[in-house]
Each structure stands twice: as C-alpha cells, then as structure tokens.
Amino acid sequence: MAEFIGSIDQGTTSSRFLIFNKAGEPVASHQEEFSQIYPQPGWHEHDPEEIVSSVHNCIEGAVEAFKKDGNSVDSIKAIGITNQRETTVVWDIESGEALYNAIVWTDTRSQHIVKELKSRKGADELTQKCGLPLSTYPSVTKLLWLLKNEPRVKEAYEKGTLAFGTIDAWLVYKLNGHEKRVFVSDPTNASRTMFMDIHTLKYNPELIAFFGDEEFDLSRIHMPDIVKSSDAKAYGTIGSGVLSGFSLTGCLGDQSAALVGQKGFDAGSAKNTYGTGSFILYNTGNKPVISTHGLLTTVAYDFDGTPSYALEGSIAVAGSGVKFLMNNLGFSFDSSKITELAGTVENNGGLVFVTAFSGLFAPYWITDTQGTIFGITQHTQRGHIARATLEAVCYQTKAVLDAMEKDSGHPLQELKVDGGMSNSELCMQIQADILAENKIPIVRPKMRETTALGAAIAAGFAAGVWKNFEELKEVNTVGETVFEAKMEAKDSAKGIKRWERAVNMCRGWLVDDE
C-alpha cells in the first residue's frame, strides 16, 4: 500500500491541510481563512478557538477529497504541523479555555515593555543565551503585556493554572483534547519565546528570571515541554474527527519547515521565501552561531537529538514592492505584468530603487531613511523602475547571504527559493546574476508547497516513511529549475557597488528639520 503523510499548515491568514505522497507530491488539500482582528493601530489578534476549528475543517475537507480519489484513510501514516511563529496563546491548563485572543507575531503593542526591558541589567547578554534580540516579535513581551493588562490572565496566574504557548503548543493541546494534557513544543518554536537556551534547547532559569519582576514570577507559569521536531510519541494523537486516533509525529515553525521542505540539511544550504517580505534561513550546522551582523540565531530542526541551527535574516519589502508599483503608481493590476514590464529593458538604465519604505533590516539596520530612487534621467522608463524593484530584493538577498556566510564560517553551497516572486523567471535570473561571484546554483522546485512539505517530512521521518536524510534528499526533485549566473562576476560586482553606494547615500534622510 502506498504511504501518505498529512500536514497541518497553520499560517497567519489561513489554515490548510495537505496530504503528500512519499515523493513529496500533494495529492489532496483544503484551505480555510479565518478572522483577522485589529482592535487598535499596531494590534493584531486571532481567535484561538477559530484557529482550531479551521484546522479541523481543513482536515475534514482534504480527507474527503483524498477518499474521493479512491485512497484509503489508513494509508496516512503520520501527521505533521507547521505554524506561524511567535504568535502567543494563553489558556487555563485545567479547562483548556483560551483566556484572551492570540497576539500575532506582527503585533507591536509591547513596545513600551521592550524599552523597559532594554534598561535592565543583563539585557545585553540575552542574544548570547537565546539567539534573539529584544523586540516586539518574540513571544515573551506579548506574554508580559497579557499579564499586566488582562485580569483573566492575571487571575489564572494567581491560581497557578496559567498556560502559555505558541500556536504549535496550543494546536497539539487542543487536537489531542485538553483532558489528555499533551503540552509540548518543538525547538524551532520554543526558540522564538526568548525563554529557551539556544545552546541546550532547554528553558533557561536565568532567562525566565530576567523577564519576571516583583509582581510576576514567570517560573509559576505552565510552559510546554520542549521535544524533538520529529518524534513518534511526544505529540500524541488527534482526539476527534475523521482522523481520530492518528498520530501527530512532527512539528516545525514555518520558516524552519520551509528549509526542511527545501532539503536544506547541509551547512551552507540556504533558502529564501520571496513573499510580501523575504525570509532567508542559512544552515550553520550543529552549533549555534551568534551573528555579528544583527541576524537571528534559531533552530533549523531537531530530528534525532542532534539539532541543526540556522541564521535568519529578513527583507522588509519584496512582493510588497511589486504591489506598491501596482497599487500606488498604477503600473498594472497584475503582478505578472510587472515582471513582464521589467523584461522590456535590458538593464536598469543606471537606476537604483532602495525600497526602504520603513528602513532596512539586516545587515544594514538603517532606520533613519525611506524609499529612495537614484539615477532617474530623461530616458528612464517604467520598465527601468520595475526592474530596479526586483533588483532591490535580489541585492538585499545578496547582502544577507554574504553576512551569513561570514558569520557562519560555512561557504554558501546553494540557494533554494520559493514564495510568489520565485515564480518570475526574470527575477530568479537577476538573483543568479547578482550572486555570480558566489558561484552557486539557485534551485526552484516545481512543487513549491515547501513549508507544508517540511512538516510532512518531520512527521514522516519519525514514522519511518523515510529512514534517513539521504532518502529525504530525493523528495520533491522532479521538475526543479536551476538558475545559474549568465553575467560575469566583474560586471555583477559593478551593480553591487552601485547598490551599496545608493544605500549609504540614503542614510540620514529622516532628520528633524526644525
């Protein structure tokens, strides 16, 4: 009998359930969007119960389609989970009831808490311990806001029944049934809380103590056990529905899942997801590397008790730059037309578009600038601006990868790509040309559901569907496209130099003119 693996893909705007065969091909799927709640500017919430319901609905829908195609449900050997990271849920450990909406990873309401934490003694040592800098992104500041502002959360804390977790922990807890108390999280998610020691993959009492105060001793809060990303028993079984009794055997945060789905198992392997923004993960091997360029240190995966680590960097404007041309400048109503427009010119005509709409992330970390276009002449056409918009993403990707290579000590081996912008042949060729001096291939799989596939791989590995990493490397290889540089490295270097000059020239634009 053929073997299949289910994958729960719980994202920021929708939930999905996909069923993959052993070759990594999706054979059935179902998707459901859920409510986005914005109570105030900068606040972003989800209803935790609606998320669970959406996951159940997706499982039912995908399995129904799977059965209609003549497949047996019993051929599904394992189920994995991948999820939006950092999003924070608090609930009562006894009743299983959520005490407040989930605070989403994009939420910035805890800025004042971050400012206060940065003033505490030992704040400058946090990154060395947990891999993350203090910001509004990690789960800890969301938890602190809830403790200080929501009476039901404080009441549960005082009763000793307050449970805290990221979306993976909440889903596992609820899918099993709260009475079973299966309360676990994998290291790729636990590493985003700032409570986990990046070196030991265990909760660090010093970190937990740092974030507490006279009113709240965070060690009293119930936190999930940290277990391997791929484990045949730790995640329990689904307690109800069409897959009741089926085992949950793997879990990965979304960006780590994408790296696994791209089979980035070797040190020096990198993946870039070109979405609204871009998320780059770079495998650094079996030891965590603390960046000197402001990159994040995270866990790539832990399948067998020997974790692999990654450096993570992000680019704020990728696909959103294309949308800017469409919505703000009226270039087109179709994103594919933007890349066609970029292809109407042979080069950028000397034009550079630094798409720093809200500053630039690593390795630049420039906050005192805005989007800037250099090199406009009377010969500039819309195609030049469109091409420069694509190039901006590719130049920033080059800068992030170079910083990762320097930090890690592992030469860049390859770049695996996915996400909406990777559909553009032109954009991927531009990326290959900009990386000419690195002499590495850019590999784009035909099947680009790599995040969901990563969760399926984690689950299937624990269930014995795949026996080793060599077998996994053969998954999802059919029809992949390889892009290699067509430009000479010396010519590529000229464009990189011009880009870096433009970045430096736009520093300091945001100043007080009064």
Describe the function of each predicted region:
Residues 58-65, 255-258, 385-413, 501-514:
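Phosphate/ATP-binding catalytic cores across multiple sugar-kinase/actin-like superfamilies
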